[in-house]
Amino acid sequence: MLIEIGHFSLVLALIFSVLLMVLPSIGLYQNKSSLAQLSKPLVWVQGFWITISFIILMSAFLTNDFSVKYVADNSNTQLPILFKASAVWGAHEGSLLLWVLVLSIWTIAVSLFSKRIPSDLLNLILIILGAISFGFLLFLLFTSNPFERLLIPPLEGRELNPLLQDFGLAVHPPMLYMGYVGLAVPFAFVLAALIRGQLDSTWLRWTRPWALVSWAFLTVGITLGSWWAYYELGWGGWWFWDPVENASFMPWLVATALIHSLSVSEKRGAFRQWTVLLAIGGFSLSLLGAFLVRSGVLTSVHTFATDPTRGLFILLFLFIVIGGSLVLFTWRSHLLQKSNQFSLLSRETGLLINNILLITAMFTVLLGTLYPLILDTLNLGKISVGAPYFNAVFVPIMIPGVIALAIFPFVRWKKDSVSRLTSLLRFNWIGISSLILLARFVITNNIYVLIAIGLFIWVTFHVIILLAKRIRTKSKFSFAFIGMIVAHLGIAVFVLGATVTTQLGIEKDIKMSVGESQNIAGYDFVFNGVKPHTKDNYSGFIGDISVYSGANKIAQLAPEKRYYQSGMPMTEASIDPSLARDLYVAIGEELGGGAWSVRIYYKPLVRWIWLGGLMIALGAFFAAIDRRYFVRAKS
């Protein structure tokens, strides 16, 4: 009975999404405020029924209700309770329900925290978000019902994918979805402004905090996904350029351009057409990501479904969103054309260069992701586009962007002079060059690492200058300024960590017998053997490896080889972490005679990658709570 209530709750949510689209629209059209004001209560009621549905599905997992097909396919009685809870979004149907739940949370948040926005515009925004909810609820109910019953329930369920039986996957998808789905909010703000023809700087100020928060969550989600892949998959890498990784990275690049474009559009009135197209593009790419994950066109550890019918539904929805948005943009584009002159050397130019680089980088990732799919669809052959392409094309595009983020905060709006900038920054360039030269002799002669060190010093020096200037002029430290500083430092930290660990990391695949020692990067790894290891949801082997630095024992590592109920083997690495380096060990197969295949990694500064990602997200959260976003609009 409870399962039927869960299904019926989704039906009610669909009905209320229709009411949310229709009744306030009639109220706005006929100028009946009583109908228009129904948008807020309808948002709350819709969210209530979606939440009830989600709670009931989770209770089905926690109580081992194998009469539900989705539960029987993705859980069993031996699964730990944490993974039973996270199994709710471990496959296609439940992850789509999570998507709808997150969308309802964002919609409620907009209705709750947008009191400064004129009621007519807010009602229109909620109508647009209701229409998006309607599309996904329709998809969920007619192609992906998580409450489908089995006529004859099994005594035991199958199993949650062993890759997902990990704490990282319990938190990574919700954070990623908060970012993915959150891009619907700036999209709805932009569409509402286009429909109303209210395209002044006010709507830009209202849109930017929502764009910042969704971008911050997307950053956290991508960072957690990278961290999970690093320690869980056993291959020691932190980014594989997997097509589904790219599907989350592309909207992140566009959203990065969006938050910068919103800034210049709000302050200077420039790039408004850019801003509108970026808001449309960001959400469209999140829908494209949903299509790639759920259509079956990709095979990946991240994909959920292999049903082309589901993919066609999302593809149709994507075409409606993009097509309708572009038609609306074309209709209102004349209102976005504002003459705003600025010189070649100005902060506007810097932000324009930033956007061009980010969008160019996005298209290189899009090409590398979709090109193999297009060739396969047209029966022109099968190819694989991997890390060599992305590293060769993407990285050179982004290096100028990192340099620019350290220069253009010093450049004045509208017009500046080379002589002023040279005078302001010349001593810093001398100091930075000296430090890079010192690093060349003291640390490494690797050109890529030296470039990364230079970029890190460059950004750090200029952050210090900005702080000193604020202190000297007794200017206020706004949250927006603090956010910019933290996020830009985060990018520098990330770039340094990613470059150093990629260029100076060491990897060895070796055969080790009991008592044997292997020296890597000045550390001695002593293999003490392997013993059987069993838990409720798996059995396998656990290794025993001691790590010494000279005569001092610094770590005891216990890598595992697990075999789950499905028979799927999993390699669980053991890591000795620090901010300076990670020592990473994974065991492979038994080679006979007590010897095992062992993979050892030395990963310098690898933690800086995720530290940088979290700093970027923290900076965005700081910027989103800046005071100017909470000033009530005048009637």
Role assignments for model-derived ranges:
Residues M1-S33, I50-I52, F66, P243-P251, ...:
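Contiguous transmembrane helix-bundle modules in multi-pass membrane proteins
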Residues M1-S9, K32-A36, S59-E93, N145-P173, ...:
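Membrane-interface interhelical loops and short amphipathic "cap" helices
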Residues V11-V22, L28-Y29, S95-S226, G234:
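A conserved hydrophobic secondary-structure block that centers on an alpha-helix together
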Residues Y29-I50, L112-S133, I195-A216, W241, ...:
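Membrane-interfacial loop-to-helix junctions in multi-pass inner-membrane proteins
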Residues V45-L62, G135, F217-L224, L285, ...:
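A generic, lipid-embedded transmembrane alpha helix
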Residues I50-D73, T77, S86-T107, S111, ...:
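Transmembrane-helix bundle segments that line or gate the permeation/cavity pathway
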Residues D509-R599:
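Soluble non-transmembrane domains of integral membrane proteins
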